[in-house]
Every structure is written in C-alpha cells, then in structure tokens.
Amino acid sequence: VKARAIVVTSGKGGVGKTTTTANLGAGLAKLGEKVAVIDVDVGLRNLDVVMGLEGRVVFDLIDVLEGRAKPRQALIRDKRVENLYLLPASQTKDKEALDPARFQDLVRHLLEEEGFDRVLIDSPAGIEKGFQTAAAPAEGALVVVNPEVSSVRDADRIIGLLEAREIRENFLIINRLRPRMVARGDMLSVEDVVEILGLKPIGIIPEDEQVLVSTNQGEVLVLKGTSPAAVAYLDTARRLRGEEVPFRNLGLDSDAQGLLGVLRRLFGGR
C-alpha cells in the first residue's frame, strides 16, 4: 500500500475501528515503521485508553491545531514498542473545533518534517465534520466492517464518500468474523461482504475474546499476544507494507477452510 496517510473509518460506530487503528499502528511499528496514530474523535477520546496511554496526555489534537502546542509536545511515545506515537483527541471540545485544512497541514508536517513513515487516522463514526477532517489528508482508507447488514450498509455509504474525495487506495478490514455462524448462514460471509462493497479485504479479523481482555487492560493485543486476532492484525500490517501474506487458518475451526479458499482466490491464488 503506497498511501502513507491512511484514514481508518467505518460509518457505523462500535465495529472495532479504534482497536483496529491501535493494533495496526503497533503492528507497523513492530515491523520497523515510524508510525503516528491520531485520534480525531473529538469529545469522545478513547484511542489513548485502548493503548493504555491516557495517564500521559498533556496536549491534544485541538491544542496543536489551534497553536497552543507543537506536534512534538503533544505526541506521546509508546514505551512498549519503538517508533509508535499517539496524538490524542480533545475530550472537552466539540467537532466544530476541527479545521480540515490545518489538519491536512499537520499530517503533511509529520510525514515530511518529523520523519514518520505512516500516519493512521482514527476517524469518528458518522459522516459529519469529524469524518471530513479525518479524511482531508488521507491518500488511502481502511474501511472497518462487521459481517452484518447494518454495518455493511453504512460502509457502502462511506466508500462512496471516499471515492467522491478521490481517495482511491481503499481496502476492507472485516472484523469479528465467526466462521461457525457463517457456516450456519447466520452471518454474512467474507464473499458476501466483498461482493456487496466491491473492495478487496486486506485484513480478516476473527472474533477473539482476547481483544476485549487486552483493551480493558490498556494493552495493544498485537504487542503481547499470539491469539487469532493478534496474528490477523500483524498479518494485516504486513500486507499494508506490501508483503504477500496468505490468509491463514488462525486456529479457528474447520468451517473456516472454505473461507480461506475464497480469500486466496480473491487475492489471485496467493
């Protein structure tokens, strides 16, 4: 994936967008990239909590955009992995404080002058000003979707908005997949989701209780675990870096085997 400024979006809240941003940021850093993750969900800040960094927040995104702090003062370095930094959202301001043009300048500054290889932008749910700001500097997008009808419908709307903004390098992350439910016909399959939305999946994240456990502990799963979701997040980070990583059976169950064949076909027989 050539895009260096990537917005992580969904349309619908509660699909695992923030957890995905944290794990992909940490995964890319683990693989050697210098990564900034930015929380644009002003007023509902939680990327700092998911990453276990809430106790170290001094300045936030709005402080930087309004000139009260320099980017370096607001960026929090994650001590558990080299080269991972968080720029937290403001908890007190509302989304009207966001300025898309200034945000675009900030992301450009991080990539061109602060030496970051990649900036991942955690977009707020919805399509209002928060999304418009988060998408302003983006060259690519990761659309996080759960395999359920309402999530897919919202994702379809977001994909249309991304294309209208001429953000072209867009991929799906299908989150919380349960192969047994798919096999019973109680959940949309990967094939269904891909067919409806017309985007290639770059990550398939299985339902995994370790995601909730690590989030509650303020630990990023990809840095500590070898559970199915941790492996899937790291594989996704590798694909973002351009590696050809086959979709594997992540210790799911035999129902997943058919799914893996579908994915390999989608990715041209890898």
Model-based region annotation:
Residues 164-270:
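C-terminal lobe/tail of nucleotide-utilizing enzymes
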Residues 1-3:
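Phosphate-binding P-loop
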Residues 5, 86, 201-204:
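Conserved beta-strand scaffold positions in the cores of enzyme catalytic domains, especially
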Residues 102-105, 109-113, 118-213:
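Conserved catalytic-core segment of NTP-binding enzymes
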Residues 5-70:
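Walker A/P-loop NTP-binding active-site region of P-loop NTPases
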Residues 10, 39, 88-91, 123, ...:
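Flexible glycine-/small-residue-rich
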Residues 42-117, 213-217, 222:
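P-loop/Walker-type NTP enzyme "switch/lid" segment
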